[in-house]
A protein has these predicted regions:
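Short, hydrophobic, well-ordered secondary-structure elements
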Residues: 80-98, 184
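Acidic/histidine-rich alpha-helical segments that form the ligand environment
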Residues: 52-65, 100, 116-156, 174
Length: 197
């Protein structure tokens, strides 16, 4: 592992399943991601995955807290979004995926729900404090919503994502963490680039 990925080793101790699934994306082995997500999302894993999602939320918040003020208007690594938009997107996505899993697990899925629209940015003017607050709020939503998934991790979830397809309820929890790491990598790369200036 290069210095570019030093942060991964620290996070892996607290979020081993999420990091293991994410490594497939980082290494260009995309089919392995789905396999790892499925393998690590079986019955009885929801509460452990929530603890791992808390670790990824903390890691995201740590990077956001260290960025200089001007960084939030810089490119955020996702299309033409700035950092504030990318972090806002992460906060909304992580809680939204877990909420969807909880609705399916509780047999409360709304009929006629359209497919997910990926790539919706957060507000462009997000501030450090506001983004950290949104990440904290997303984790609280996850902790409440995931209780419904406990014992239903292998239940089908009708959530349709055009890039991911369909996953089981517990798999969406773990995938929320993989998505966190995709953006966390972008933030670490930006932070390192700013440090070299």
């Amino acid at each position: 592992m290069t210095d570019r990925y030093a942060w991964v080793g620290a996070l892996e101790r607290e979020a081993p399943d999420i990091v293991a699934a994410w490594r497939g994306i980082d290494e260009g082995r995309f089919l392995s991601v789905r396999r790892e997500v499925r393998r690590r999302s079986g019955t009885g894993t929801a509460l452990g995955t929530v603890a791992q999602l808390a670790a990824t939320a903390d890691a995201l918040s740590d990077v956001v807290e260290r960025l200089p003020d001007h960084a939030f208007a810089l490119p955020g690594g996702e299309g033409d979004w700035n950092v504030a938009e990318a972090v806002g997107h992460v906060a909304t996505s992580r809680s939204g995926l877990v909420l969807a899993a909880s609705l399916a697990a509780g047999d409360r899925w709304p009929p006629g729900t359209p497919a997910v629209l990926p790539g919706i940015p957060g507000p462009a003017t997000g501030t450090r404090d506001g983004l950290v607050r949104r990440l904290d709020q997303s984790q609280r939503v996850i902790e409440r919503a995931a209780r419904a998934v406990e014992g239903h991790e292998r239940d089908a979830c009708p959530l349709e994502h055009p890039l991911v397809g369909r996953l089981r309820c517990g798999e969406w929890l773990l995938f929320a963490g993989v998505h966190d790491l995709m953006h966390l990598e972008q933030l670490h790369d930006l932070s390192a680039a700013l440090a070299r200036q």
